[in-house]
Amino acid sequence: MNVLIIGSGGREHALAWKVAQDPRVAKVFVAPGNAGTATEAKCENVAIDVLAIEQLADFAAANVQLTIVGPEAPLVKGVVDLFRSRGLDIFGPTAAAAQLEGSKAFTKDFLARQNIPTADYQNFTEVEPALAYLREKGAPIVIKADGLAAGKGVIVAMTLVEAEEAVRDMLSGNAFGDAGARVVIEEFLDGEEASFIVMVDGENVLPMA
């Protein structure tokens, strides 16, 4: 079978490399891919942007039997929903589920509603209430741009001055564009960070490692 990998980063390179090793796979297309994926055996780059989801669906319908999505942005845009509506097999969460990655405020509110332990927080869209909250809580404290910011939207502020600067940069300085139009101000937690990643289909849970 043929497989399409959506994305252009190292994550997608690793996915393409691994998928290509499966003897059941004849060809791996990577859209848009990168210089590394272009050199892998059985892999071919395709010049389609990750957010051109209609074009990706057209390509998949004509060329592949399975699509795997790497980046968050097309997931949030609804690439999985579109593919499924057209009867195309695709691995990834729906746009609704992808909000857990696409919006930190959504995720924090979800955790709070479900009584899942999480650091204390508040969401803000205006500078002055956010600054007042900072002064109430003090430092160290964590400032997060709500939306996708290419991994750069989190500031661990060790001083109040640094925290206030981060809030102003995000909410009024447009430091992260629309991603920073809302911020999450979160309690600073000291300790080791660990991730446990699983695959789910709504009923079954499969650990990846």
Regions found by a protein language model. Give the residues of each.
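ATP-binding N-terminal substructure of ATP-dependent carboxylate-amine bond-forming enzymes
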Residues: 1-96
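Short beta-strand-to-turn element immediately C-terminal to the catalytic PLP-Schiff-base lysine
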Residues: 7, 124, 155-159, 199-201, ...
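Structural detector of well-ordered beta-strand residues that form the stable sheet scaffold
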Residues: 29, 68, 91, 119, ...
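A conserved helix-loop-beta module that forms one wall/lid of the active-site cleft
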Residues: 93-153
